[in-house]
Design a protein with these regions (language model features):
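Central regulatory/effector-binding core of bacterial HTH transcription factors
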Residues: 1-26, 176-180
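C-terminal regulatory
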Residues: 26-107, 112-137, 151-154, 158-182
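Catalytic strand-loop-helix junctions within cyclic-nucleotide turnover domains
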Residues: 148
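A short beta-strand structural signal in non-transmembrane regions
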Residues: 140-145
Length: 182
């Protein structure tokens, strides 16, 4: 959903991007359709110092604790940073799986998609903390290169696009993450 995904699509490294942000200027030749909205919630391990604090957490409190962030893979486009505070120490990890592992170990704190952390909350392995600032809501899309070739879209891409027309498929992609992350 960061710039690296757009870059891979625009440069032809991928034919289809699922979960991409629609906030970037479309350079042309890219078809974009809504996937849905995904709420991000603030999570920490039960043994993290922020877990003990009462009430909504203020930015002035958060800035003193290391955030865990997934690195943007963009090489040519400007990388994007989200939900980090100026001056905050950051542990940058390569994937959402790594971010969840770091949060579970108490190595930092951070916003994660609500469905990704649902099982850990239910198991008591992570704690939900309210923040004074609004929790982010991501409007996600799926996108593909419309001008793929003179022969048209490949069969696999056509199949995926047909599947993505279904609201059930789109909801499953947003909500069903049990067993995929630690």
């Amino acid at each position: 959903m960061l710039a690296g995904t757009w870059e891979a699509l625009v440069t032809g490294q991928v034919d289809l991007a699922i979960g991409i942000s629609g906030e970037y200027a479309n350079p042309g030749g890219i078809e974009l359709r809504p996937l849905g909205e995904l709420a991000f919630v603030f999570r920490v391990a039960p043994h993290h110092p922020l877990a003990l604090l009462q009430g909504p957490l203020e930015d002035a409190q958060l800035v003193h604790h290391r955030a865990v962030a997934v690195a943007d893979t963009a090489q040519r486009m400007t990388p994007i940073t989200v939900n980090l505070l100026p001056g905050q120490d950051v542990l940058t990890v390569p994937s959402m799986r790594s971010k969840m592992e770091a949060l579970l170990r108490g190595l930092g704190c951070g916003f994660v998609p609500e469905p990704f952390a649902r099982a850990q909350i239910e198991a008591g392995r992570l704690v939900h903390k309210e923040t004074a600032r609004a929790s982010p809501l991501a409007r996600l899309h799926y996108a593909w290169r419309a001008e793929r070739s003179a022969l048209g879209l490949g069969r696999a891409l056509q199949w995926w696009l047909a599947q993505l027309e279904s609201p059930v498929t789109r909801l499953a992609l947003l909500e069903r993450h049990a067993g995929l992350l630690p």
